[in-house]
Amino acid sequence: MVEDSQETTHFGFQTVAKEQKADMVAHVFHSVASKYDVMNDLMSFGIHRLWKRFTIDCSGVRRGQTVLDLAGGTGDLTAKFSRMVGETGKVILADINDSMLKMGREKLRNIGVIGNVEYVQANAEALPFPDNTFDCITISFGLRNVTEKEKALRSMFRVLKPGGRLLVLEFSKPIIEPLSKAYDAYSFHILPRIGLMVANDADSYRYLAESIRMHPDQDTLKVMMQDAGFESVDYYNLTAGVVALHRGYKF
């Protein structure tokens, strides 16, 4: 129950007090962490790997640079960036959820990604890094879970170096109406059943579907990034807008 005096936000389709959302999202990801990679492959039929590959290709990351993989989870992007920046560069895998961070650290160490990767538990709304630290920041399927997205975007802008870029990979609004209806049917009816069968957790995947619906559409997120200070903001619709990659620069 939310008191009238409390500031509210959404948790999926629920209206909750702002201070409650972070804990509720944390519960979701504590629950799904061990099955996160398996569920990503099942939910997207493996296409998430292509979306992430495109993000890497658009990042412009070079040897010797410093990269922040925010809401980096199990480290798919970090693994690629680690090879790209080489021994003279650095990648920080940051996530607010310690269960996801532990899964990412274990996974990357098991495949030999060590030496130039650091792990930091961090809230996107108040990043614990100095101004002008990173050449590139990515946040992949994480922004929709943030309570105050505008505050998080301003925090990302602050820690980017001049000339740096932010890439936001996130579920978005399909641009083809028949696909939009089919996507809703899949998200709200099939996805929770897959979550129940594979992860024994239908509720977390019901939240996933609801959080996608509540996330700002392509043009709204573009304006939010511009309002946070980013310039030359553009976006790419992937899989007909099921996912969008937004990119903006700090000059």
From Swiss-Prot:
<feature type="binding site">
    <location>
        <position position="74"/>
    </location>
    <ligand>
        <name>S-adenosyl-L-methionine</name>
    </ligand>
</feature>
<comment type="pathway">
    <text>Cofactor biosynthesis; ubiquinone biosynthesis.</text>
</comment>
<feature type="binding site">
    <location>
        <position position="140"/>
    </location>
    <ligand>
        <name>S-adenosyl-L-methionine</name>
    </ligand>
</feature>
<dbReference type="InterPro" id="IPR029063">
    <property type="entry name" value="SAM-dependent_MTases_sf"/>
</dbReference>
<keyword id="KW-0949">S-adenosyl-L-methionine</keyword>
<comment type="similarity">
    <text>Belongs to the class I-like SAM-binding methyltransferase superfamily. MenG/UbiE family.</text>
</comment>
<dbReference type="GO" id="GO:0009234">
    <property type="term" value="P:menaquinone biosynthetic process"/>
</dbReference>
<dbReference type="InterPro" id="IPR023576">
    <property type="entry name" value="UbiE/COQ5_MeTrFase_CS"/>
</dbReference>
<dbReference type="GO" id="GO:0032259">
    <property type="term" value="P:methylation"/>
</dbReference>
<keyword id="KW-0831">Ubiquinone biosynthesis</keyword>
<dbReference type="InterPro" id="IPR004033">
    <property type="entry name" value="UbiE/COQ5_MeTrFase"/>
</dbReference>
<dbReference type="GO" id="GO:0043770">
    <property type="term" value="F:demethylmenaquinone methyltransferase activity"/>
</dbReference>
<protein>
    <recommendedName>
        <fullName>Ubiquinone/menaquinone biosynthesis C-methyltransferase UbiE</fullName>
        <ecNumber>2.1.1.163</ecNumber>
        <ecNumber>2.1.1.201</ecNumber>
    </recommendedName>
</protein>
<feature type="binding site">
    <location>
        <begin position="123"/>
        <end position="124"/>
    </location>
    <ligand>
        <name>S-adenosyl-L-methionine</name>
    </ligand>
</feature>
<keyword id="KW-0489">Methyltransferase</keyword>
<dbReference type="GO" id="GO:0008425">
    <property type="term" value="F:2-methoxy-6-polyprenyl-1,4-benzoquinol methyltransferase activity"/>
</dbReference>
<comment type="pathway">
    <text>Quinol/quinone metabolism; menaquinone biosynthesis; menaquinol from 1,4-dihydroxy-2-naphthoate: step 2/2.</text>
</comment>
<feature type="binding site">
    <location>
        <position position="95"/>
    </location>
    <ligand>
        <name>S-adenosyl-L-methionine</name>
    </ligand>
</feature>
<dbReference type="Pfam" id="PF01209">
    <property type="entry name" value="Ubie_methyltran"/>
</dbReference>
<keyword id="KW-0474">Menaquinone biosynthesis</keyword>
<keyword id="KW-0808">Transferase</keyword>
<dbReference type="GO" id="GO:0009060">
    <property type="term" value="P:aerobic respiration"/>
</dbReference>
<comment type="function">
    <text>Methyltransferase required for the conversion of demethylmenaquinol (DMKH2) to menaquinol (MKH2) and the conversion of 2-polyprenyl-6-methoxy-1,4-benzoquinol (DDMQH2) to 2-polyprenyl-3-methyl-6-methoxy-1,4-benzoquinol (DMQH2).</text>
</comment>
